[in-house]
Amino acid sequence: LARLLEDEIVIVDFICPTNETREAFGKPDILIWVNRIEEGRFEDTNKMSQDPTDCDLEIKAGLTVDQEVQLIIKQFKLPDWKAPTTLLLGRYQPWHEGHQALKEKADERTGQTVIAVRHTQGISEKDPLSYKEVVEFISKNGVSRPFTIKVPNITNIVYGRDVGYKIEQVDLGAEIHAISATEKRKELGI
């Protein structure tokens, strides 16, 4: 329900011993089975328990919690919250080859990029796409499991003294700079 209301990632952690009860929650995008316990303390639950038939990753006993977290981050290409990260901020109406080239340059800087999508849908005719539609365009154009966040219509960025990051403009060359989002929207009929 939270995912439907907010259109964001939701993580659910619970013990659900049967396939039937798991199916009642719907199909998750990612299902991780943490299979550490051979037998629980409740005999009735042990008797009815069914191993998941379809999981994306099974974690067995023997790993530390930190090792489990690193395995999940690596397996699903999730962001490492402590690693240096490059921020791309834009409308991406729609995501196109120029944005893709910029993301590739951003990845070269730190190896991890957050794509911050400004919430501008409906502000003008140049902003027809919702956040969800923008993320779909990003995914369709070669970005596997993009780390995107929805942000307000940010129009100004200010900072005080040197605070440990830099703001830089990347020159992608005349051919990339010539790409027009307006023309892309016309081509796509949006």
Regions found by a protein language model. Name each.
Residues 1-39:
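Glycine-rich phosphate-binding loop used to anchor ATP phosphates in small-molecule kinases
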Residues 27-28, 53-54, 144, 163:
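Short, structured coil segments at secondary-structure junctions
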